[in-house]
Amino acid sequence: MRSNYIVIEGLEGAGKTTARNVVVDTLKELGIEQMVFTREPGGTQLAEKLRSLVLDIKSVGDEVIDVKAEVLMFYAARVQLVETVIKPALAEGQWVIGDRHDLSTQAYQGGGRGIDQQMLATLRNAVLGDFRPNLTLYLDVTPEVGLKRARARGELDRIEQESLDFFNRTRARYLELAAQDDSIRTIDATQSLEGVTRSIRETITAWLQEQQA
């Protein structure tokens, strides 16, 4: 079976870490052992420094990060990760399991921040070309539920401290994009842990069967 790039997406508190564990267990049960794990922003020395700049509320003191500067930092981190980690791993036959990818930018910056979608499309095409995940699992949860979970984890980062309206716009854009792309599968993340686990397993199994058809 050829290598694939699977990405897990969702709002803060959607349960991405739990979902990743389910994905890994499911793939291992199917005999897939060679996996590389990534997160965005991050995953390389350069990308991790950019992550700190864009997410740590103390990284630039009182300076306000312009929304366009923010999106450019996300893309700088992304291209470094894709070119130095993800593509080489896929070429070696390893599966890549990612915590966030470009869909986050389309939802958070395009939906939440309201950045022009044509600008984002131009950036995406310039940086990524036709590179896309083979499968994206979007964990759908209301902002109220997600933020409650996130707050329970401890201190929030710069984006996690955004308004409820911001996250409502972000979620709406996620759902809009998921409805337009067959490679994005929506998982109801408000279910019980058992329900989410079952949904992810069923989704991956069905997707793999589609690939082999």
Curated annotation (Swiss-Prot):
- GO terms under cellular component: cytosol
Q: Which gene encodes it?
A: tmk
A biological-process GO annotation: dTDP biosynthetic process
Q: Which reaction does it catalyse?
A: dTMP + ATP = dTDP + ADP
| InterPro entries hit by this protein | P-loop_NTPase, Thymidylate_kin-like_dom, Thymidylate_kin_CS, Thymidylate_kinase
The organism that produces this protein has a lineage beginning with: Bacteria, Pseudomonadati, Pseudomonadota, Gammaproteobacteria, Enterobacterales
Q: Does the keyword Nucleotide-binding apply?
A: yes
The entry's function note states: Phosphorylation of dTMP to form dTDP in both de novo and salvage pathways of dTTP synthesis.
Stated family: Belongs to the thymidylate kinase family.
Keyword Nucleotide-binding in record: yes
Q: Which GO terms describe its molecular function?
A: ATP binding; dTMP kinase activity
Q: What is this protein called?
A: Thymidylate kinase
Taxonomically, the superkingdom here is Bacteria
State the organism of origin: Enterobacter sp. (strain 638)
The protein's UniProt keywords, in alphabetical order, are: ATP-binding, Kinase, Nucleotide biosynthesis, Nucleotide-binding, Transferase
Entry's EC annotation: 2.7.4.9
